[in-house]
Amino acid sequence: MPAQLLDGKVMAAELEEELKKRVEALKEKGYTPGLTVILVGDDPASQTYVSNKEKACARLGIRSRTLRMPADTTQETLEAAIREANADPSVNGILVQLPLPRHLDGDRALSLILPEKDVDGFHDINAGRLSRGLDCVVACTPKGALHMLKRAGIPISGKEAVVVGRSNIVGKPMALLLLQENATVTICHSRTVDLASHTGRADILVAAIGKPRFITADMVKDGAVVVDVGINRVDGKLCGDVDFEPVSQKASYITPVPGGVGKMTIAMLMDNTVAAAEKAAAAL
């Protein structure tokens, strides 16, 4: 029996309806959430991502400002823009669109963002608080993936969860979130020996490695929940890290690419921005 689709479009639209109400409640108190996006250079994919974020802000009534900076922007100029946004009380969220041009130090730039305005959840303080199970801003993609599992009513506690990928942006925070939900978590990566022996026992399998259709049906056990975080372009078409058609015949639930976790990532960016605005408004 084919797997049930975890539809990111539907779930993101549902979340946006909830966020609209929260934004309206803030505006009734005279407070409008604000997001500043810093885009350096003219990378086409980054331009698309930023455009999608601007559209999401417009739908929800969030004030959006994009600082478009040339590719030869200096580190000093980038850092000055971040400090200016930090100091602006009308800005609740700051996002530096990655990747940055190679001559720029992205880690240093991200470390300058105030943790409470770090709506991407990449700041070392937010990452550290997540590892301790403390209140923090959570990275949007793993937060979105977890939201999809919970929204679908999929049990997590006590389940075997395997995360393939150990990036700071997805793999590590995903593993920590699943651990907080009382799953038994294994992280696999490029040096894992006999990967299929690990993925084959997963009740929940998260693929976040950036290799098109890498997870094949023989690596997945019957009835597994498969979350595909990958976004790859092959022959002009988008695909994930999972070989979707054959795997969907074995899994109980699966996220599609496109239309899966990617849709939730932007929705969670909006959620983080609204939450930051709510905290700022409460402190006035």
Stretch-by-stretch model annotation:
Residues M1-Y31:
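Positively charged, low-complexity intrinsically disordered leader regions
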Residues L39, L95-P99, V164:
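Short beta-strand segments
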Residues V40-E54, C136-V225, K237-S248:
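Glycine-rich phosphate/diphosphate-binding loop of Rossmann-like nucleotide-binding domains
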Residues C57-A71, V185-I187:
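Short beta-strand elements in bilobed, periplasmic/extracellular small-molecule ligand-binding domains
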Residues T77-P89:
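Short, well-structured alpha-helical segments in soluble
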Residues G93-I156:
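Anion-binding alpha/beta catalytic cores of soluble intermediary-metabolism enzymes, centered on
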Residues P99, I209-K211, G230-I231:
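Short glycine-/small-residue-rich Rossmann-like dinucleotide-binding loops
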Residues G106-H123, A127, G230-A282:
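Rossmann-fold NAD(P)-binding glycine/threonine-rich loop
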